[in-house]
């Protein structure tokens, strides 16, 4: 076969590949949400409070320990479960109990959840409990208007000075 025919065949193969690639880059049409829906993303990491408080060892307790283990303050590593609730218009949209990861159950619990909701004006209530006793440690209520096809992100920051808690980004 002659050299020009090889180049022509190779060019046609590349052109055919480009046409197929171009077709599948735009077709079939895909929509990630129905036309009248918006998306709520709940995403954050949070290390809960310790299950047991730190305590100081007495001199008698320290004397019983090996010399290399004599640390006055003892802090158990295990953390509490994180309970997260998200309500929309008075109805529970999401509820989860997150167990702390790690061998000692001392890691930060992580959450990532996509929740499709109808577009429009809604009242959201986000709650988080990160200690064993008592009710929810953090509660945030917000009236938000969600446009169709838009994404709202709900984040959580416990270390924000002045206003720790949930952050709604619309």
Report the location of each language-model feature.
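Short loop/turn and low-complexity linker motifs enriched in small/turn-promoting residues
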Residues: 2-170
